[in-house]
Amino acid sequence: MAHIEKQAGELQEKLIAVNRVSKTVKGGRIFSFTALTVVGDGNGRVGFGYGKAREVPAAIQKAMEKARRNMINVALNHGTLQHPVKGTHTGSRVFMQPASEGTGIIAGGAMRAVLEVAGVRNVLAKAYGSTNPINVVRATIDGLENMKSPDMVAAKRGKSVEEILGK
């Protein structure tokens, strides 16, 4: 797992996986490479990209570009999640729940990379079903997208934040 920093708005970029894939043609096999990357600002913005090319650096570059284009905003609560969330994509299911300060990121492989670049500092997370990195990343992003802050819920219901939080 490589960690590459760029100056483009101080985005953190992480390479999750590089695979060699092949296409069988009449004359044999044509090999190409795929790269899965995540990009985030460490403050609630995160995106992932999947690139494919004949050479590894080109695949990584394509993936990074796609990740920068497909960023979402995540409403964080002091470096952790707002509430427990579940995310799914095909055969992968992920469960993430907020954790107290000092816990750290307790998550596996691909999920850890997404949470780190998103700016989550304390979380308990578990992946169920398929652990294919692409599906786990998509499921994690799905879970983070579905997370609602108390402000969002209050606005949707037409109530005050105190009423939502039960204070």
Swiss-Prot record:
The keyword Ribonucleoprotein applies. SUPFAM superfamilies: dsRNA-binding domain-like (SSF54768), Ribosomal protein S5 domain 2-like (SSF54211). GO terms for molecular function: rRNA binding; structural constituent of ribosome. Keywords: Ribonucleoprotein, Ribosomal protein, RNA-binding, rRNA-binding. InterPro entries: Ribosomal_Su5_D2-typ_SF, Ribosomal_uS5, Ribosomal_uS5_bac-type, Ribosomal_uS5_C, Ribosomal_uS5_N, Ribosomal_uS5_N_CS, Ribsml_uS5_D2-typ_fold_subgr. Belongs to the universal ribosomal protein uS5 family. With S4 and S12 plays an important role in translational accuracy. The N-terminal domain interacts with the head of the 30S subunit; the C-terminal domain interacts with the body and contacts protein S4. The interaction surface between S4 and S5 is involved in control of translational fidelity. HAMAP family: Ribosomal_uS5_B (MF_01307_B). This is Small ribosomal subunit protein uS5.
